[in-house]
Regions:
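A short alpha/beta connector and helix-capping loop motif
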Residues: 19-47
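N-terminal nucleotide-binding beta1-loop-alpha1 segment
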Residues: 5-10
Length: 175
């Protein structure tokens, strides 16, 4: 299998003050670890950037909208304005197929929104989806963020997404 890393909404508004997700520092370290290993393996890296509506912290052009980890040469930046990256970018699955990508490692924010929906979108388009446990996060809602993320992992695993510790994820080089 040829792997790609999809970093979803790894934007300043989620990982930096004033509105970071709980455990932002450890999530950032996990995301950086995945990114460095993907780059080291020559895997394709896809940075997904959410375009929030006017006035939101991720409104295009604002500081909160900026990527935490700038894209390197050859890496893709795709923008979206809905939870499923694939629905927002109809050509993405075909572009990945053209690059012989069969597996997408998914990490980022928020577990119960864009991470979950993009994982489902990957499956819908015939890709193997791997959710990097420990490298996705959300905000506290009716229960702690960690409980929400764990529930999403269980739900996605039941739907066919592989859930693997970010430390155990390996990457195969893109052709």
């Amino acid at each position: 299998m040829t792997s790609a890393l999809m970093l979803i909404d790894v934007q300043r508004n989620m990982l930096e003050p004033p509105t970071p997700v709980p455990a932002a520092a450890s999530i950032r370290e996990a995301l950086q670890d995945l990114l460095l290993r993907a780059r080291g393996a020559g895997a394709l890296v896809i940075h997904v950037q959410n375009d929030g509506p006017p006035g939101e912290p991720d409104e295009p052009g604002t500081d909160g909208w900026q990527l935490v980890f700038p894209a390197s040469a050859g890496e893709l930046i795709v923008r979206k304005d809905q939870p499923d990256t694939f629905a927002a970018n109809p050509a993405l699955a075909k572009d990945l197929a053209a690059k012989e990508i069969t597996e997408v490692v998914i990490a980022g924010m928020q577990s119960n929104y864009c991470v979950a929906e993009s994982s489902r979108g990957a499956l819908k388009h015939g890709l193997q989806a791997i959710l990097a446990s420990g490298a996705h996060a959300t905000y506290d809602e009716n229960e702690p963020a960690s409980a929400i993320s764990a529930q999403i992992e269980r739900e996605l695993a039941a739907e066919g997404v592989s859930v693997l510790s970010f430390r155990k994820v390996s990457f195969d080089e893109a052709s």
